[in-house]
């Protein structure tokens, strides 16, 4: 992102990161 809207790729990356933190 550019800081405006999260792309699908960025959403997926964030989802993976969150799952790793659990």
UniProtKB/Swiss-Prot annotation:
Membrane topology is: Peripheral membrane protein
Name the reaction it catalyses: a ubiquinone + NADH + 5 H(+)(in) = a ubiquinol + NAD(+) + 4 H(+)(out)
Just give the chief location class.
Answer: mitochondrion
The subcellular location is:
Mitochondrion inner membrane
Question: Which EC number applies?
Answer: 7.1.1.2
Q: What class of enzyme is it?
A: translocase
- State the UniProt keywords alphabetically: Membrane, Mitochondrion, Mitochondrion inner membrane, NAD, Oxidoreductase, Translocase, Ubiquinone
The keyword Membrane is assigned to this record = yes
> Can you quote a single GO CC term?
mitochondrial inner membrane
- Any one Gene Ontology molecular-function term assigned to this protein's record: NADH dehydrogenase (ubiquinone) activity
What function is annotated for this protein? Transfer of electrons from NADH to the respiratory chain. The immediate electron acceptor for the enzyme is believed to be ubiquinone.
The annotated subunit structure for this chain is: Complex I is composed of about 45 different subunits.
Q: What is this protein called?
A: NADH-ubiquinone oxidoreductase 16 kDa subunit
Its source organism is Solanum tuberosum (Potato)
Which lineage do the record's taxonomy fields give for this organism?
A: Eukaryota, Viridiplantae, Streptophyta, Embryophyta, Tracheophyta
């Amino acid at each position: 992102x550019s800081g405006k809207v999260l792309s699908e790729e960025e959403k997926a990356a964030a989802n993976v990161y969150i799952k790793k933190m659990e």
